[in-house]
Amino acid sequence: MDRRYCTVDVFTDRMFGGNPLAVVLDAGQLSKAQMQVIAAEFNYAETTFVFPPRDPAHSAQVRIFTPRSEVPFAGHPNVGTAFVLARELVAAGKPVPERFEFEEAAGIVPLRVLCEDGVVVGAELQAPEALTRSAPVEIESTRLNSSHPRLSRMPSSA
């Protein structure tokens, strides 16, 4: 199985610094099991796999794997993947967009390509909103007014 890939050091300006990342370009027909084996072989914190987007309005579908499992989102893999894809466009003589939008398990991830004097130097992302779950106020209030022995010794907030 021949696949093109690139390794990159993210969050650094020197080789072998920062966070290493493997980016598998044109992941094609790789199965989840195959991606997992490849990620385990690289043994980096994360490895990304790039597929064509499902929606042509987006830049790519990106799947992120640790050596043990797939994850819905992670910061440095997105930054590194955007950097690699932008550099690939430059190498092919194609224009580099100001933004990429990756389709991921966590949702659409927008990234901005950073250029200095026409050279791709990095990328930055806006993380998707965190998923939170909070209890309704009535339930929280009930807990605070509980007759539990520990709570009964707490000073009243009123």
Tell where the protein language model's regions lie, with residue ranges.
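N-terminal, positively charged, Ser/Thr/Ala/Gly-biased leader segments
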Residues: 1-17
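Short, low-complexity Ser/Thr-rich regulatory SLiMs
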Residues: 12, 51-54, 113-117
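Generic N-terminal amphipathic, Lys/Arg-enriched alpha-helix
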Residues: 16-24
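N-terminal beta-alpha supersecondary unit
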Residues: 23-24, 38-43
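Acidic, low-complexity central loop/insert segments
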Residues: 37, 58, 65-143
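Conserved phosphate-donor
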Residues: 44-61
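Single conserved hydrophobic/aromatic residue that forms the stacking wall/gate
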Residues: 139-158
